[in-house]
Structures are given as structure tokens and as C-alpha cells.
Amino acid sequence: MIFFLFIQAVLNIALVMSDPDMEGIYLFKAQLIPFLCALPFIFKRDFRKNFSKMLYSYCGIGFLSLAIDYALRSHVGLIQLATVFVPLALYGLFHFAVWNVQRAKERFSLAALAMSSLSWGLYAFAFPPLPLGPGALVFLVPWFIVLLRSNMQTALFASFWSGFIYNVINYYWIYNVMNVGPAVLIMIGLILLISYFSVYNTIAAAVFVKARDVKIKGIPVLLILFPLFYAGLEMTRSIGDFSFPWSHLGYALGNQLPLLQALSIIGIFGYTAIIIASNLAVAEAFVKGKKFLIAAPVVIFALLFGYGSFVLSKPEAAPFYMENEAEAPKVAVVQPNIHQTNKWNKAYYDSVVSKTWQIVNDSVDWKSGDLDLVVLPETAIPDFIRFRSREKLWLKNRIKGTQTSLFIGALDFDREGKPPRPVNLYNSGFLFRPDEKNYTRYIKTHLVPFSERLPFDDVFPILNYVDVGQGNFVPGKERPVFEPYFWSPFICYETIYGAEARRSIRNGSRLMVDITNDGWFGKSTAAAQHLNQLRYRAIENGYPIVRCTNTGISAFVDQYGHEDLKTELYTERVITRRIPLRSRDTLYFHIGDAVEYGLLGFFFAYLAALFIRLKTWASAQP
């Protein structure tokens, strides 16, 4: 083994010293040499006996060589990258397959998988637009029964694959969003993404199994606190470049407005904790005979419904209360219904823009004279606006002589980027005012990972050389508020981040205007789920919302979550109404940041407490 390591070290040092004069991700055939020299060792008995150690050593030396090469010259050899990570990935997949085969041979493991799949399969159908939301309070009971009765290996097996099924059902539409490259790469990427999401279920299962038997003075404290841990686990999906906080469990109750009013107190993560607590209580009732716990879902439902009904019975909670006040702006939302395949095809550009302009001219009520704002969707101009003088002139002329502003989505760029992309690309919104010569630009701050940008491309500039058809946008930093109606622009994916809504309100905003192109989702449930998430933001913060989409669902949402003029998918519509500005203060607006970062801290504290308790318990054993 020492000879093998020596050979690999010498070869990798030689590769680093060879210093190929190439930029970015480069091809250098000599990087195959360490891999080819490693192959003969496979036929040695000692190598096969210590295959894992040899493989990890080989990959470790190769990774160190890659890191040094990147640190010195800011480039990476594609061949070396492949010869280091592909063997490790194949080895991991082999062991994962063997582990799954072993679990599948166990009858109880298959039964556990069936029960867990029933749970998560049902839960996937609890989200809007389906009306099964209240079932979320009991759908996960079979999964928790499995976790209460299974060993670690069975729990992990059942949780990963049932999570995979759940995520396939819940995220099947991602294929349409990712459809920007070779089909094989898209499918591989989709499988990896679904697997990544499923890891969260697996982590929850592993922690639960470890925590279930830990007691402090006979009380299963960690088990009692598990709902808060799960909420903290969901919070981890809201931070970092990989963040994708789309399907938090609490979103399942979105179709029942009375059930949502407690969002103003506990927010989305509080709802997740309540749902986990309800399911765990019923599972405990079945497994441990604590029959009184079986009433938990009924009690929780009654409390949520009772509180929500009380809140909605107040006069100020009437739909769009104070809509006729002078300060309530009159807003027109244009849904042009441009098919996605035409939208980004240059051959259709003129027809796409002409159709949009015709709708704006013919269907918007310009004659009333009291229209304050016209809103068009994300990338309604499917090009860089600074190259389109004709379109800018048309927009300025359209609002000239009126009191109406116009907000529209388009692309933009500047030349302040870094190599290899000296140009920064922006997904933007542009506000045209009748009394101003120039427009005001807003840049989208949260970009969809892998679709609009590669995660950590600012930390590792080498990723800017990777091109598999994804967007290469740069995020903005500002959260502006536009006068005179104190509204803040949001673009698409940003609205699922509660912290951004609170940030805009702290900046003085009293109305959210969201533009999006949900045409990427196709005819799927994603558009309804997206609107549902906006509804949660409205109730959490008492924040009215105007939503404008390309293909639907456009709508107006008031500060209690009432919806009005909700459009159908793939219809051409213009909807217009007055929308009252924010006049409701909520507890969660004030404590939301503390709650969410508190849950994040609790997540890590829970893991630390579990580790310390298990270590103490193990050391106390004879």
C-alpha cells in the first residue's frame, strides 16, 4: 500500500508541476496517468482486501492535487475531476445498492416501506389545489409507527424511498423547469435533486430513532421536542445557495382560510411543528396505548378553525376591507398567456411582443382615468431591454399623458462581471412612470438554483465555466419600495422566502407586487402551490399582494388571505381592482426572524444534545 501511495503522490505532484496553460475547466490527457497506473493494483490480493482504504487514499491524493491546482491557477482539469470523483461515486452507489437489496430481503423492511410510502404518498396529495389539506394532521401516522417500532436500518430504508416517492409526486413538474439541456443530463439531474430532497426525510428518521429512547428522569424530552426539531430541519432548506423552501409540510392547509389565520402568530414553521406533533401523538396512541393522544388532530383542527373563524368574523377582516379608500391603488394585471416554447424563440419575438402590446392597449381600462398601476409578468419582454429602444418608446408613449405607472419584467445586463463572463446578467423588473424620462430597475434577489444560476458560483468562480444550459444570472441586493403607494416588487421564486416579505415591510412597503412566469411549470399543480405560498406570506405579515403571471394563476390577495379575480391557467386575461394597502400589524411580522433563526439554532442544539446524551449513556454501560 505504501508503494501505491508513493506512486500516486509522485504522479499527482508531477501533474501539478506540469502547469498546463489553460483556463477554466480544461482537458489534459496526461491526467489519466494516475488512474491508469492504479488499475494494475486491483489484481493484487492485498489491494482487494483493503479496497476501501486504497480507494479513499487514491481519491484523497487526487482531490488534494485538484485543490492545489485550483488554488495556484484557478483552473480544474476535467479528466482529473472525473477520475477522482466517478470511482468514488460508483463505489458509493454499489454499496447503496447492496444495502437496499439486503433491506428488501427483510419482510419487516418491506412492510415498513409500504406503510411509510402510504404516509408520504398521501401527504403529497394534501397540498393545493387538492382539498385534502386537513388530512395532513393524520397522514404521517403510519410513518411514525414505523419509526417507533423499527431499528435504524429499516427506518432509514423506509424513509428514504418513501421520501423519494413523495418528492417525485410533489416535484414532477421540475422536469419542465430544468428542460434547458440534454435530456439525459436533465434526468440525471432530476434524480439527484429528488434524492437530495429525500435525504431530509432520512435525516429526520435517523434522529427520531436515536431520540426515541433517550429519557431524562423518565421523560422522553427529545421525542417531545421532535416537532420543533423537524421545523428547524425545514428551516435549513431556506438558507444557502441550495435553498429550495417549496413544500414545507405546513403549506398543506392552504385551501381552508379559517385554518390559516394562526399564521399571523406562529408562521409557516409553526404549522409544520403542529402537523408533526399531531401525527406523532396519534402514532404514540397506537404504539404505546396512550389513547387520550388520539384526540390530538381533532383538538388541533378545532383550535385552528375556531381561532380563524373568530379572526375572520371581525369587520376589518372582511374581504378587501377599505378597498374604496382614497389611498387604495387601482391596479390592472395583464396575463398575456404566451406559450413557453414561443416566448424564448427569437423567431417569435415580434409576435410575442405584439400580442402583449395589443392586450395592454385593448383590454386595460385606460379611459377610466383612475388607473394607478399596470403590471405585466416576468420577462414580458423576453430580451435585454436596453437593446429594445422601440419597446421602451412604446411603453413611455402608452403611459404619456396619464397618471398610470407601468411595471414590466425583462432582462438586463452590465459590463462589470468577472472572467470568464465579463457581463452580469439580471432577471429584472422595470418601472415606467409618466413623469419620468428613465425607468427604475429592480433586480431579482433570490435565483432558482441550477435553473437561473449554479450554487456557489461566486465562491468558486470555476463554476462560471460550466455550461449545461442553465441561466447565469447574478442576484440583486436591494429590496426597494416605490412611491406613492409604497409597494415592493418581487419576481417569481422570491415570494416563498418569508424573510424577504418582512424585509420589504420594514423598508416601508405596504403592498407586494409579484411578477412571475409560471409557464415553466406547464399544466401542473405547481402554479396553485406557488399562489398558496403567497397567501401564507399575506397572512403571516398582514401584507396585501398583487400577483401577475404569464400563463396563470394571477390574483389579488388581501392581508387576511382572501383571493379575488383568480385567473385560470393558460387563459388571456386582464384583471383590475382596487386593493387596500397594509393596515394590519401581526405578531409574526415582528418575531418571524427570531423564530426562524431560533429554530435553526434549536436544530443544531437538538443534535448536540442528542449526541451528548447518547455518548453519556454509552459510557455508563458496563
Task: Please place each PLM-identified region on the residue numbering.
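Membrane-embedded alpha-helical bundles of multi-pass enzymes
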Residues: 2-316, 523, 534-537, 548-551, ...
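Short, conserved active-site loops that position catalytic residues or coordinate cofactors/metal ions
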Residues: 127-142, 166-173, 335-336, 369-384, ...
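Acidic/histidine-rich helix-loop elements
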Residues: 177, 339-354, 454
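Membrane-interface junction motifs in transport/secretion proteins
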Residues: 267, 333-345, 379-380
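Hydrophobic alpha-helical transmembrane segments in integral membrane proteins
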Residues: 300-332, 339-342
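Short, well-ordered beta-strand segments
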Residues: 330-334, 488-490
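Solvent-exposed soluble domains appended to multi-pass membrane proteins
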Residues: 348-350, 373-622
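Phosphate/pyrophosphate-binding loops at sites that engage ATP/ADP/AMP, CoA/4′-phosphopantetheine
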Residues: 359-372
